[in-house]
């Protein structure tokens, strides 16, 4: 389907707006993936707060121009599916990684975080906000328990020395 200039400008503006407010971006090649599988992926993306769109490469290059995802311009070759994480930096990468396990033809091309290309595996393994808080609380709890054990051991040693 041919797009006129106004449609192209609208697509570039839409993707640029999504890129401006995103925490991370992932580019993938979805050739050979069934329509049903892609529909499921789009539904999961909406639920995870991920903006996802198939965009022509020239329009994608123009859309990310001047944003922190300008580093992705070289990856826009062949069919490109671009996803921007809005709520959590690892959401799109985690979604694509899980989807690629089920669909062997789905290939993750690149990922970007804070203006630099990043390994999608690293982005996918980032803990969510709740997981990070839980880990922090666990560390604090272990530290205070360890301090208590050392204090009791010091008191025991003092009594033995006396």
From Swiss-Prot:
InterPro entries documented for this protein: Ribosomal_uL10, Ribosomal_uL10-like_sf, Ribosomal_uL10_bac, Ribosomal_uL10_bac_type, Ribosomal_uL10_CS_bac
GO molecular function, one term: structural constituent of ribosome
Name of this protein: Large ribosomal subunit protein uL10
UniProt family annotation: Belongs to the universal ribosomal protein uL10 family.
Any single GO CC term annotated in Swiss-Prot or TrEMBL for this entry: large ribosomal subunit
Assembly and binders: Part of the ribosomal stalk of the 50S ribosomal subunit. The N-terminus interacts with L11 and the large rRNA to form the base of the stalk. The C-terminus forms an elongated spine to which L12 dimers bind in a sequential fashion forming a multimeric L10(L12)X complex.
Keyword RNA-binding in annotation: yes
Superkingdom assignment: Bacteria
UniProtKB keywords: Ribonucleoprotein, Ribosomal protein, RNA-binding, rRNA-binding
HAMAP family: Ribosomal_uL10 (MF_00362)
CDD domains named in the record: Ribosomal_L10
Tagged with keyword rRNA-binding: yes
Encoding gene (name): rplJ
Role according to the record: Forms part of the ribosomal stalk, playing a central role in the interaction of the ribosome with GTP-bound translation factors.
Source organism (scientific name): Vibrio vulnificus (strain YJ016)
